[in-house]
């Protein structure tokens, strides 16, 4: 009987997954948009239903109004944000990361960060059928999903709208030539997908306690369900949701509730690796969405090439030509390091110096992410977990064996590099969107290990140690100035190391892989080996940053290195500029000092960060430094390009606002 009860519980979990997965499948199948904010959109339905219940509205109206409100919000996000990124999937994905932060923090501001439960006579009613308990909300959710699946099946299989949507999913260009109104169909899919999430969220609020951060734990599995079931296949989504929910529910009952999420993640990982096209119908290209560095740099790189040609052809003297060829960016790097070196002198207060230290530590992690993305085109979302590996290695060696800091540092780098190597071997052979999903899943598995291996990590309580890094000869790092300079020296060493990698033959091979993988492979480049190698280097650098973060905070917990830290690292690099050397440092400076300068609370600061990330992707995808670099190139043409024909080819300053000419987005708007 207990087994039957667990299967019933699995049914409720599968229904929750299905409400997210159906929306993902419909939207992703048509737009190739990796929308990781779908879990937060479901939570909006939960919060709105909770508010309507508190306002005293009938329960049916609470569910209906929450569904309609979320559908409208989803369509607004489509028109204002996602519609601008149809030809650049990576930018759409990054926008969804920003929306995760925005919706989470806005929910905290509006509803608070406590766990919320909706209690009504309906929610507490339970049916007992031969010893098996069925709650009234569970029955409502199951019946609703059966009706919803019937409607969706009829809509997509038997109507003109459904056939048009499937045609667009298979080949958008051909569908456009046939006269199918792409914009209307995309609006339709966003409305339907968001409404399903809102409906599921409203009923979810009647079944489970939730808070502002509950969405992330469901969206990974739901995205895997959409892919496993086959994009666009309603039947596949149903089967895949059961396939993942049942092992998780049984593991929770018979093995360990704390390890239960790991089973769902492992099953999803294995199926994505060995059955990437789905169990049933698949769009066939769902995992082949091309995440390209060019989404953030195309026109900027083209303008740099024109600038180099103009300098070579210009009539300026040889000394001045060499200075111009040296470039603004390298001057900027030297100036940045001089300013960072003088920070303890410039920043007189201890609080400002502490912020500067935090900035430098984040910049170290940002440089590692920058290396993989800028050099190899590998968009990694594992920064937080790999920093955690380094931080826990240092904390464990210090706590149990009192190992010297200068031995902890290489051990942590090696451990994080080894974990990154394993992740790379597992995930990097997959295509872009699958790689993002797999790395997030494997990162969550690492965080679960941190939480559950209490004998090593002390679980969610974590490890605390106030000891400073070990002295180096006469230098003691107990003071704020000395610790800052330690972090600064590690940033300088990391930057020099990355510069050497970029200038090496290995770095040039990575560029060839980034620009054209198939061509690089045809020229004899071992693409898989080189990508795994650069991912391993990224892990080692992240491990070093994790050690420094542990010594900066003087404690370590699994929550310290969870998904929000990864999103912060992505924000730092993209905010500063993903294709310029100064990008990680400038992005880290803005990220660290902005709350202090504007006197923002932590919640408001995170909300501002999310808005900044979305605004940067929409308004200036090359980042702050990339924007100024573009303006510098344009100004150079106007002031110095005197050779005939050079001025005529000068780039328009306004072109740097958006390096991607999103023609497809314009067609469907």
Go through each PLM region and give its residues.
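Transmembrane alpha-helices and adjacent helix-loop boundaries
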Residues: 16, 90-94, 98-114, 130, ...
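Hydrophobic alpha-helical segments within and immediately flanking transmembrane helices
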Residues: 16-26, 34-54, 73, 77, ...
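Short, non-helical or kinked segments that cap or interrupt transmembrane helices
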Residues: 15, 24-46, 87-92, 161-164, ...
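Transmembrane alpha-helices
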Residues: 14-23, 176, 180-204, 216, ...
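Membrane-helix/interface signature in polytopic inner-membrane proteins
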Residues: 151-190, 207, 215, 496-534, ...
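Interhelical loop and adjacent transmembrane-helix boundary motif
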Residues: 2-6, 48, 205, 225-227, ...
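Short, hydrophobic transmembrane alpha-helix segments
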Residues: 2-5, 25-34, 50-62, 83, ...
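Mid-bilayer segments of alpha-helical transmembrane spans in multi-pass integral membrane proteins
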Residues: 71-72, 76, 96-114, 134, ...
């Amino acid at each position: 009987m207990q087994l039957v009860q667990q299967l019933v519980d699995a049914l409720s979990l599968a229904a929750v997954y299905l409400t997210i997965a159906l929306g993902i499948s419909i939207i992703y199948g048509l737009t190739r948009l990796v929308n990781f904010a779908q879990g937060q959109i479901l939570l909006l339905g939960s919060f709105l239903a909770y508010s309507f219940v508190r306002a005293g509205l009938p329960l049916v109206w609470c569910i209906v109004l929450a569904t309609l409100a979320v559908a409208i919000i989803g369509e607004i996000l489509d028109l204002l944000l996602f519609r601008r990124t149809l030809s650049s999937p990576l930018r759409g994905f990054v926008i969804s990361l920003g929306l995760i932060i925005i919706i989470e923090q806005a929910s905290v501001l509006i509803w608070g960060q406590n766990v919320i439960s909706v209690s009504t006579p309906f929610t507490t009613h339970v049916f007992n059928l031969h010893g098996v308990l069925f709650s009234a909300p569970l029955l409502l959710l199951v019946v609703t999903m059966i009706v919803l699946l019937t409607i969706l099946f009829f809509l997509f299989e038997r109507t003109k709208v459904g056939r048009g949507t499937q045609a667009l999913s298979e080949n958008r260009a051909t569908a456009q030539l046939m006269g199918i109104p792409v914009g209307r169909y995309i609006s339709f899919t966003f409305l339907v997908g968001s409404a399903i999430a809102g409906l599921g969220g409203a009923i979810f609020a009647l079944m489970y306690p939730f808070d502002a951060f509950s969405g992330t734990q469901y969206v990974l599995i739901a995205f895997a369900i959409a892919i496993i079931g086959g994009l666009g296949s309603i039947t596949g989504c149903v089967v895949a949701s059961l396939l993942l929910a049942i092992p998780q529910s049984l593991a929770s009952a018979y093995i360990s509730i704390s390890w239960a999420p790991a089973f769902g993640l492992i099953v999803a990982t294995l199926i994505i690796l060995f059955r990437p096209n789905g169990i049933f119908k698949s769009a066939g290209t769902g995992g082949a969405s091309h995440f390209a560095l060019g989404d953030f740099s195309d026109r900027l790189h083209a303008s740099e090439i024109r600038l180099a040609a103009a300098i070579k052809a210009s009539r300026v003297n040889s000394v001045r030509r060499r200075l111009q060829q040296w470039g603004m960016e390298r001057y900027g790097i030297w100036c940045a390091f001089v300013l960072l070196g003088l920070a303890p002198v410039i920043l007189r207060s201890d609080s400002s110096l502490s912020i500067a230290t935090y900035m430098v530590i984040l910049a170290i992690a940002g440089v590692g992410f920058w290396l993989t993305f800028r050099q190899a085109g590998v968009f990694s979302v594992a920064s937080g977990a790999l920093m955690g590996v380094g931080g826990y290695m240092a904390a464990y060696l210090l706590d149990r064996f009192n190992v010297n800091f200068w031995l902890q540092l290489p051990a942590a780098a090696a451990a994080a590099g080894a974990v990154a190597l394993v992740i790379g071997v597992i995930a990097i052979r997959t295509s872009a969107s699958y790689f993002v999903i797999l790395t997030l899943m494997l990162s969550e598995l690492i965080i679960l290990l941190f939480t559950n291996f209490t004998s090593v990590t002390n679980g969610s309580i974590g490890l605390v140690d106030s000891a400073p890094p070990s002295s180096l000869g006469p230098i003691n790092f107990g003071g704020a100035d000395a610790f800052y300079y330690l972090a600064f020296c590690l940033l300088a060493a990391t930057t020099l190391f990355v510069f050497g990698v970029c200038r090496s033959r290995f770095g040039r091979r990575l560029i060839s892989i980034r620009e054209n993988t198939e061509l690089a492979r045809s020229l004899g480049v071992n693409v898989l080996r080189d990508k795994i190698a650069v991912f391993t280097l990224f892990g080692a650098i992240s491990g070093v940053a994790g050690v420094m973060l542990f010594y900066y905070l003087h404690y370590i917990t699994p929550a310290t290195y969870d998904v929000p830290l990864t999103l912060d690292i992505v924000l730092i690099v993209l905010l500063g500029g993903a294709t310029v050397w100064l990008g990680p440092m400038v992005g880290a400076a803005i990220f660290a000092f902005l709350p202090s300068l504007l006197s923002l609370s932590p919640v408001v600061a995170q909300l501002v960060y999310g808005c900044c990330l979305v605004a940067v992707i929409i308004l200036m995808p090359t980042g702050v430094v990339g924007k100024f670099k573009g303006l510098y190139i344009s100004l150079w043409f106007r002031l110095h390009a005197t050779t005939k024909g050079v001025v005529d080819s000068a780039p328009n300053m306004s072109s740097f606002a958006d390096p991607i000419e999103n023609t497809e987005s314009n067609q469907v708007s």
